[in-house]
């Protein structure tokens, strides 16, 4: 019976992992579709599409699925029309979150996001309720390995970006720039250093709250995880970071 139970647990875990993988693929395909619809189908001429394809390849999304998503988005194939929406809300202890979604039904998504916030000790707010706590910037991220920070920094100075910093904890180099300069800055870094790990518009907190309380960390982690488990939610940004208790 122990062996049977263990096998059942393995099957259960594999099923959960497969479901997560399938959901991730769905979100990647959705981003590729929207990116292709908004611009040219050639990734070299459409940076958002290029970034979406790069992200999809990192997650091993099959090539045929990528090509089909682009073809469906740019052809005459009837398909879903997705709307980009940003929801703002407060988490436990007054923390602030911005939830980015791609949805084909805004009423359904708003209801689901509101329910998750309320169930996890937060509340969904109105537009502008927390975004004033953030700066809206262009964000470009490279892995530290393989890219020299001094070279990135020098290039950033030439391009007059807002900031170039090292995130040793995550092993990343992070560049931020003005929204109006994002396109040219992203393309200039791509031309010199190749495709970044991440390149998008982002809400960066003006004051980052460091949280070390384990109970609060668990609550916030549960909230963010459940939000990101929603099929329509692409990603979540917040004004907090978790640190080890002293």
Swiss-Prot record:
It is found in: Cytoplasm. Pfam families: TACO1_YebC_N, Transcrip_reg. Residues 1-22 are annotated as: Disordered. Its main location: cytoplasm. The keyword Transcription regulation applies. One of its GO terms (biological process) is regulation of DNA-templated transcription. Belongs to the TACO1 family. This is Probable transcriptional regulatory protein WD_0484. It comes from Wolbachia pipientis wMel.
